[in-house]
């Protein structure tokens, strides 16, 4: 199927915003289509225990008639396949999306080469507890050395455990 999209930088002080800004202006069409989610990292409490029970398959990114991003994601786990649809509204800054009504505070594209990978940071909020992830999206079933290196760099600099 495909991989997910973008990432957020709200309460993280350890990574300067300037590192994510070099991407320039966003053309949402550069993110459209199927993506494999090849790696996920987080420092959320339950992540280390749950990571062996989940296998993220991918995401398909499309545009809505309102020009927002829509993601159809598929995740395999012990209970079978779960699918979800999420609409993300573009903020004024080029690579930031949100949908606070469903708990997505920010989604940022941290890095991409516009050809085969994107590193996505997501800040979610469930109740009053924030939950952050970094994900490696790839247009192919295996990631390039460049993509893996950037994913590892971002994950480690944020102190995340990877899956």
Curated annotation (Swiss-Prot):
Which CDD domains does this one have? lipocalin_6
Keyword annotations: Fertilization, Secreted, Signal
Q: In which tissues is it expressed?
A: Predominantly expressed in epididymis.
Where in the cell does this protein reside? Secreted
**InterPro entries from the UniProt entry:** Calycin (IPR012674), Lipocalin (IPR002345), Lipocalin_CS (IPR022272), Lipocln_cytosolic_FA-bd_dom (IPR000566)
Keyword presence, Repeat: no
* Coiled coil stretches, renumbered: none
Record's signal peptide: 1-20
GO terms in the biological process aspect are:
acrosome reaction; calcium ion homeostasis; cell maturation; cellular homeostasis; response to calcium ion
- Gene Ontology CC: extracellular region
Q: Name one Pfam family in it.
A: Lipocalin
- Molecular functions (GO terms): small molecule binding
Q: What is its main location?
A: secreted
| Protein family per UniProt | Belongs to the calycin superfamily. Lipocalin family.
Q: What role is this protein assigned? A: May play a role in male fertility.
**Stored PANTHER family:** EPIDIDYMAL-SPECIFIC LIPOCALIN-6 (PTHR11430:SF10), LIPOCALIN (PTHR11430)
* Protein name per Swiss-Prot or TrEMBL: Epididymal-specific lipocalin-6
